[in-house]
Amino acid sequence: PVGIINADFLREVNLYTGAFPANRRDALSSVIEMYQVDGSKEQFNFRGAIGASDLALTADGPIGENTTYIASVRRSYLQFLFAALELPFLPKYNDYQFKVKTKLNEKNEISVVSLGAYDVNSLNLEANDTEEQRYILGNLPVNNQWSYAFGVVYKHYGENGFDTWVASRNYLDNKAYKYQDNNEVDSLLLLDYESDEIENKFRYEHTSRFDNGLKLNYGGNFEYAKFFTDNFNRTFFGGESVEFNYESSLELFKWGAFAQVSQELFKKRLVLSLGVRADANNYNEHMQNLLNQLSPRFSASFMLTQDWYLNFNTGRFYQLPAYTTLGFKNPEGVAVNKQNDLKYIRSDHFVAGLEVLPDDQSKFSIEGFYKKYDNYPFSLIDSISLASKGADFGIYGSEPVESIAEGRAYGAELLYRNRDLFGINLILSYTLVRSETKPLKESLMDLWWIPTTWDNRHLLN
């Protein structure tokens, strides 16, 4: 119900459902860019807010002549609301966020940004009157996790553009357990999961703009990641109990490069953009080759009138499977997914639509889309694509898989965005969508495409 980002920090939000910028990686369906506000240069400000689900405190102001800050903390009381509504799960969250920005001189600035959270999801065992409540209580594990992200951004402004250096570190500690019938006896243990994910990242990029309408962006990234898991999982397959009990650790070096060029033509009536990026890592031989993850993208926007635009974009995008899947080991301690030549998940996009800009603050658009997915991890335990398990309860992905599943999503979307509607940054959308996967069982091949668990048909956000 609530994201880790405090909305008070947001200056601008850009949602990309296609034509992802080449400097954004590891995304298949959409990208959200969020830009934070700076703290006040003139005075100290303090705000307290009591919402429907949490208490939030925010402060901002100057630190000396050239430095500003903004910081907030939030604590939820959502668990009391859920208990009153007799919901079977009780989420609690606590988070913090801050940004400190220093303008060194006219051409150089540095920002320090951090956010973190501690979340606990417990079960409300008294809410068990209905079949739906009992199903959730029987499947949802007790879960708690804490995380943080910390980064430093340095920018140098030149005559026609600027250079950006970004160094960051993020950490996620995740624990979950589940007992049969929620009876906490050792012999009834179904799940006891703990994992740690640590990522240390560096990115450089250069952006230039020229008087002839040309924009150029290029750069590269490097990342060192560590993953550890201690996992006990008892599941049932073919009427028999199957146990996985292992510890696993994984170290990954990731690297990538990107470039994108955009050009305005015909007195800015036509804007063309062509970009490419490539990513790789040292997990296995296939993933080490940048050319195996070559990701081109192209977009065009034509101005029909002053406020009406016709848009088109296409591209191929890649995403690394989850660490839980990359680091899985069988009871003999063998990294079977590495042996199975696990691959990056691939998605091909085709999107076209119409956009209306009534004023500088608002946008209305309608677009049709077709997105094809390949190399999705396919479970060798229950013959289900991991794409369908993401809508279910609990931990998933810690199992033997092969990169053989296919999927597709297609439909149309209506979107309205206003950056200042009575002081609110509003994004409202309705999506008519079909989400389907191709079954691999011979008995189902005559169906060809079947709905996934994400096949909601109608989405309102």
Question: What are the roles of these predicted feature ranges?
Answer:
Residues 43-45, 81-88, 133-140, 149-153, ...:
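Extracellular loop and loop/strand-boundary signature of outer-membrane beta-barrel proteins
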Residues 27, 64-80, 126-132, 163-190, 228-235, 251-285, 307-350, 370-399, ...:
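Surface-exposed extracellular loop regions of Gram-negative outer-membrane beta-barrel proteins
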Residues 17-19, 36, 50-54, 63, ...:
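Transmembrane beta-strands of outer-membrane beta-barrel pores
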Residues 265, 370-372, 393-461:
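Gram-negative outer-membrane beta-barrel transporters
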Residues 216-309, 320-321, 442:
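Signature of Gram-negative outer-membrane beta-barrel scaffolds
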Residues 109-158, 163, 171-198:
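Flexible loop and strand-edge segments within Gram-negative outer membrane beta-barrel domains
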Residues 1-15, 96-98:
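Short acidic/polar hinge/loop motifs at secondary-structure boundaries
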